C-alpha cells in the first residue's frame, strides 16, 4: 500500500463519532436490490439475505458482497469456498424475510437445486450467479468478499420486477419500467449499463 493510499484511508476515518441511527437513515436513501447468498455446509443448505451485493469487474468477471464479521452463514461460505447469489423479485418478500431472520431452518418450504459449484439455487428467482470465493478483505465490522463468477442464469424472456429495499422497507419500480430501455452508449461508468435486453 503506497503512502498516498495510506494517507487517503486515514483521512476517511471521522474524528468525531457518527450517530449510528443517522448513519443508517442517510444510507437508507440509497435504494438496493435484495439477494440471498447461499452455500452448502456439512451437507445442509445455508443462506442469508444480503443487500450489499454488487457487480465489481467485467474482466475478469467479479462480484462482491459484505457479510458481518459475526455471521455464521459467512463462516459456512468461507469454509465451502463457493456461493450462489440469488436475486429476488417483487413477489419474494417472504423469501427475503425468511433468510433475513434467525430461523434455524431457513430452507423449510423453499424449493431449490444445486448449482454447478454445489451451492443452492432458489427456484423462481429473478437471476442467479454461481461464484467461488476469490478474496476476502477487511471492511470495518464487515468483510468485503470478492467472488469469481463461474456461471450465470439466463435472462428471463418475461422480466419480473425486482424486489427493492428503500428507507427501511420493501419497495418496487413502476410497471412501465420493466420494458427494455433504448440503447445508449453514454454510460461507460455503469457496470450494468443497458443493452438491447436490459433496462435502467
Feature map (PLM): residue ranges:
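Basic, polyanion-binding surface patches
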Residues: 2-200
Amino acid at each position: 500500500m503506497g503512502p498516498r493510499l495510506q494517507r487517503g484511508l486515514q483521512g476517511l476515518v471521522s474524528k468525531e463519532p457518527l450517530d449510528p441511527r443517522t448513519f443508517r437513515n442517510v444510507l437508507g436513501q440509497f435504494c438496493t436490490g435484495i439477494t440471498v447468498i447461499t452455500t452448502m455446509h456439512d451437507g445442509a443448505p445455508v443462506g442469508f439475505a444480503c443487500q450489499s451485493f454488487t457487480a465489481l469487474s467485467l474482466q475478469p468477471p467479479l462480484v462482491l458482497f459484505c457479510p458481518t464479521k459475526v455471521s455464521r452463514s459467512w463462516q459456512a461460505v468461507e469454509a465451502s469456498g463457493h456461493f450462489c447469489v440469488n436475486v429476488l423479485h417483487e413477489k419474494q418478500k417472504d423469501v427475503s424475510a425468511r433468510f433475513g431472520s434467525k430461523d434455524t431452518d431457513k430452507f423449510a418450504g423453499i424449493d431449490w437445486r444445486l448449482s454447478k459449484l454445489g451451492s443452492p439455487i432458489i427456484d423462481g428467482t429473478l437471476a442467479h450467479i454461481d461464484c467461488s470465493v476469490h478474496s476476502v478483505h477487511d471492511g470495518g465490522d464487515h468483510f468485503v468478499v470478492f467472488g469469481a463468477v463461474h456461471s450465470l442464469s439466463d435472462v428471463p424472456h418475461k422480466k419480473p420486477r425486482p424486489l427493492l429495499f428503500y428507507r427501511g422497507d420493501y419497495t418496487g419500480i413502476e410497471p412501465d419500467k420493466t420494458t427494455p430501455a433504448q440503447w445508449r452508449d453514454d454510460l461507460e461508468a455503469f457496470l450494468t449499463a443497458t443493452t438491447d435486453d436490459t433496462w435502467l
